[in-house]
């Protein structure tokens, strides 16, 4: 059996959820969209089912997968509905919906739901991606109330730069939201992962922890006690001696500065490890750090074993996890941890805890 695998620590997931809820102080929807950021939505939701106040997913199909897996807590559709027929499924499966644009208001106007809808009304407070502008928010809220088809309305927004504590954008968005919603009743939800950890003023009724659940800290240089949930690992499957000056791999991107003992590892970019990382990117072999050498290929990558004389065939190689933070690999690849985690595929997933 190929040794490439993703080890998912469900105890760490629960730890991170409790940390998020404790830091925020209110209720928390665990965000498990995009297959729980690549970790397995059904497995992660089941692991949190006894603790979570609810879950958030992207769209209806993701919610139905959770219901089929036995999840009966509230589930919020962050993108809302796309067509009138979806409202029947929303009611049938007791789902909550975000309303963030006029077409969704029109869908509700023309619907005849069997039960009142639970709506989260989204304001565009400055991210300019989704939501009603400040002057549109009260009319949208009133239209929902007057429809007679809505039960509760939670007011929400989303921050563009909560993971940048030195910039004013989050404060400006907070001010815009509070000004626009001052006279409107109902619960509020503002805090994403960055705001949970770094912006206490954004702590209201509901938090929406996402990336922090999976142990990738969104805040720079601030140890927050998160535990990595995924360890991406494989093993050394061959060892080769590379003479000083000899090239290695596609494009001869690496030339040995000295006689080099190279370990071939059964994992590549088809498994989700980024091709863009440079020579020198850290890996851990049997818990000891060394470096990537040569270009990452589809199924394989190569590491430097020269200074690890005890390492060899079968040695465990951690690409990210407890020894190698996924944020470090994301930085090397000039991307974000979200993308790396969501892209893990083809490897064997093993769950513990």
Swiss-Prot record:
Gene3D superfamilies: Alanine racemase (3.20.20.10), Lyase, Ornithine Decarboxylase, Chain A, domain 1 (2.40.37.10). It comes from the Bacteria. The active site is at 33 (proton acceptor), 250 (proton acceptor). One of its GO terms (cellular component) is cytosol. Keywords: Isomerase, Pyridoxal phosphate. GO terms for molecular function: alanine racemase activity; pyridoxal phosphate binding. CDD domains: PLPDE_III_AR_proteobact. Its EC number is 5.1.1.1. One of its GO terms (biological process) is D-alanine biosynthetic process. Substrate binds at residues 129, 298. Coiled coil: none annotated. PROSITE patterns: ALANINE_RACEMASE (PS00395). It catalyses: L-alanine = D-alanine. InterPro entries: Ala_racemase, Ala_racemase/Decarboxylase_C, Ala_racemase_C, Ala_racemase_N, Ala_racemase_pyridoxalP-BS, PLP-binding_barrel. Catalyzes the interconversion of L-alanine and D-alanine. May also act on other amino acids. Belongs to the alanine racemase family. HAMAP family: Ala_racemase. This is Alanine racemase. It comes from Aromatoleum aromaticum (strain DSM 19018 / LMG 30748 / EbN1).
